[in-house]
Structures are given as structure tokens and as C-alpha cells.
């Protein structure tokens, strides 16, 4: 089994955070999120696919991951390229921005994989934040947009045995300043939280219907 992590180029990272974090800070945020994800994947073979050489060097030398230099545009094409370059059939695909994922989640997925062809966990926005496939070509990948529903549609169309893994922590992907608040609440002992605290970022509750947090910098 391989775990595939597609990573966007550094120059296009987390643009919705650009008014809150500099480009260098966003890069370091990503690297720390990858450290947290790799910690959860201890004992598994990880493959990072990216077109960015700095990301690939980090993955190879710090994360000790296999690397695939992305050749084609689009998330689905990047993952398919990784499929073509690995021998393993069983795969788990996860994004690079879910630093709250834990080893316990992965242990659950591995146990469930004995009984199911496909296991999926959604993002809060209807995306796919974890996808296990017993065989890498089992379905047509349909990332982007409401991919959670699209992947379920693929599973049902093929009469696959599938399981919806419900996890708030996996559902949290980091795209906006408010998302950082979840790290402060749920991310104790993570590289990501420690990095954000070092930037002087603070989170306070918001007593209104317009969001849950006030995220600010000292």
C-alpha cells in the first residue's frame, strides 16, 4: 500500500491566506502540515507528487518519502501519474492540508480496508480529504468541486463495497484565516500549531453568526 499526497506549487499555495500570511509563511505552514501528516502515516510508504522542486526535495530528504515530478495539469492527472509510477495496487490519497489527521485514523482505515473496496472521508466543503482504494484503478477520480459526492457516485455505479469514514479532524483543511482557529482548538502537540504560535497568531471566540473565531496577530 502507498499513501499519495499531491502538493500544489509553492507559488500558488493557499492564496486565501495571502492577506494574513506572507508567501514565506504560507510555505512554512505547508511544510509543517506535511510534517504532521507524515507523523500520522508512520510505518506506511508515502509518495509526494508535485511539480515544485522545493516541495519534492523536502519530501525526499526530510519526510523520507518517494517523489513523483508532476508532468500534467490538474489534480486528477497528478494522482493518475503517481498511480502509473507505483507498483502497489492499494492506495490512500490525502491532501497536504489536513494537519489534524492522527495515526488512530489511519489505523481505523487499515482495519476497515479488509472489508471494503473504497473508504472515503469528506472535507467540510464537500471535497474528499481521504480516499482509500483497494485497487488504484477502481474508479474514475473526480477531484475538485463536490468530489465527495462524485466519488460516492462512482462507487455506487460500480457496486463497490464502500464505507464513509466520518471524522471532524480529517474534515478540517486549512484554506482561510478562520480555519487556523481549528488548529488552535484541536491541534495541541502539532508542528502546525507550534509554528502558528511562533508567528504570534492568536484565536478568540466570536459571539456572532459570522464565523466561530477571530484570528489575529500580535
Swiss-Prot record:
It is an enzyme of class 2 (transferase). Keywords: GTP-binding, Nucleotide-binding, Nucleotidyltransferase, Transferase. Disulfide bonds: none annotated. Homodimer. This is 2-phospho-L-lactate guanylyltransferase. It catalyses: (2S)-2-phospholactate + GTP + H(+) = (2S)-lactyl-2-diphospho-5'-guanosine + diphosphate. One of its GO terms (molecular function) is GTP binding. Pfam families: CofC. Belongs to the CofC family.
Amino acid at each position: 500500500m502507498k499513501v499519495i499526497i499531491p502538493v500544489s506549487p509553492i507559488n500558488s499555495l493557499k492564496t486565501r491566506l495571502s492577506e494574513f500570511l506572507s508567501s514565506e509563511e504560507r510555505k512554512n505552514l505547508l511544510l509543517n502540515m506535511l510534517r504532521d501528516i507524515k507523523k500520522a502515516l508512520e510505518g506506511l510508504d508515502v509518495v509526494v507528487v508535485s511539480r515544485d522542486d522545493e516541495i519534492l526535495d523536502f519530501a525526499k530528504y526530510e519526510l523520507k518519502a518517494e517523489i513523483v515530478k508532476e508532468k500534467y495539469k490538474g489534480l486528477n492527472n497528478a494522482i493518475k501519474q503517481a498511480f502509473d509510477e507505483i507498483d502497489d495496487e492499494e492506495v490512500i490519497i490525502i491532501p497536504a492540508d489536513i494537519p489534524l489527521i492522527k495515526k488512530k485514523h489511519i489505523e481505523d482505515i487499515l482495519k476497515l480496508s479488509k472489508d471494503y473496496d473504497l473508504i472515503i472521508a469528506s472535507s467540510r466543503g464537500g471535497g474528499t480529504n481521504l480516499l482509500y482504494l483497494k485497487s488504484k484503478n477502481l474508479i474514475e477520480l473526480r477531484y475538485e468541486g463536490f468530489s465527495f459526492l462524485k466519488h460516492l457516485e462512482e462507487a455506487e455505479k460500480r457496486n463497490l463495497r464502500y464505507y464513509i469514514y466520518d471524522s471532524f479532524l480529517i474534515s478540517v483543511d486549512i484554506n482561510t484565516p478562520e480555519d487556523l482557529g481549528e488548529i488552535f482548538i484541536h491541534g495541541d502537540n502539532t508542528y502546525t500549531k507550534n509554528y502558528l504560535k511562533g508567528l504570534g497568531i492568536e484565536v478568540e471566540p466570536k459571539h456572532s453568526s459570522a464565523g466561530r473565531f477571530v484570528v489575529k496577530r500580535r
